[in-house]
From Swiss-Prot:
It comes from Photorhabdus laumondii subsp. laumondii (strain DSM 15139 / CIP 105565 / TT01). GO terms for cellular component: ribonucleoprotein complex; ribosome. GO terms for molecular function: structural constituent of ribosome. Keywords: Ribonucleoprotein, Ribosomal protein. HAMAP family: Ribosomal_bL36. This is Large ribosomal subunit protein bL36. GO terms for biological process: translation.
Length: 46
């Protein structure tokens, strides 16, 4: 999984890529081609 500062190009790499928000981070998931997985954002420290 790649950590990127911008997901603009990551979401257009494959037609099946989707952006999902989980736990304060943005994820790009691609079930048909998992090598396109990416994440944006850091975990907030408490």
């Amino acid at each position: 999984m790649q950590v990127l500062s911008s997901l603009k190009t990551a979401k257009t790499r494959h037609p099946d890529c989707k952006i999902v928000s989980r736990r304060g981070r943005l994820y790009v998931i691609c079930k048909s081609n998992p090598r396109f997985k990416a994440v944006q954002g850091k975990k907030k420290r408490r």
